């Protein structure tokens, strides 16, 4: 059985579950009651995911950017280092009375040093 050690990012409209190795393994899109786009959490062969393949010598850590829904997954090895930021935006309306929740998932990959493989 898989561990259930997942990070989550969402915007009150939907959410993505991101494994401790940085793979998006569950995402219903654009809403919680929509069909899944990624579902390898339930079926590794048919479910699909969006992630990275790195060598076994990488150290992978996850944390949230303080006071945000932005999940940071950092990949470090002797070869190089990079960080992946995952988030779903949630905007306040211009008049401040509500929120705009676009159906968007952002995955920002930031190179830090070396030549990651």
What feature does the model see in each segment?
Residues 2-20, 24-117:
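Beta-sandwich/jelly-roll carbohydrate-recognition scaffolds of carbohydrate-active enzymes
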